[in-house]
């Protein structure tokens, strides 16, 4: 699984955890994806991974 939203393309982003002493360690933020069976903006019905932001916005009709 590529951890990318099938609708908007949102994926993993990288950054740092910053402690009080300003030490920086690598970390990543992963998109909140759900496996959804539904009708997508292109009109096709399929199962795919969609971020919760797209689900809340109604970009996918859940079947």
UniProtKB/Swiss-Prot annotation:
Record keywords, A-Z: Ribonucleoprotein, Ribosomal protein
GO aspect biological process, one term: translation
A single Gene Ontology CC term: ribosome
GO molecular function: structural constituent of ribosome
SUPFAM superfamilies (alphabetical): L28p-like
Similarity remark: Belongs to the bacterial ribosomal protein bL28 family.
Listed name of the protein: Large ribosomal subunit protein bL28
Gene: rpmB
């Amino acid at each position: 699984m590529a951890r990318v939203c099938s609708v908007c393309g949102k994926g993993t982003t990288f950054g740092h955890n910053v402690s009080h002493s300003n030490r920086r360690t690598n970390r990543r933020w992963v998109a909140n994806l759900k496996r959804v069976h539904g009708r997508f903006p292109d009109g096709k019905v399929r199962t795919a991974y969609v971020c919760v932001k797209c689900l809340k916005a109604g970009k996918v009709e859940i079947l």
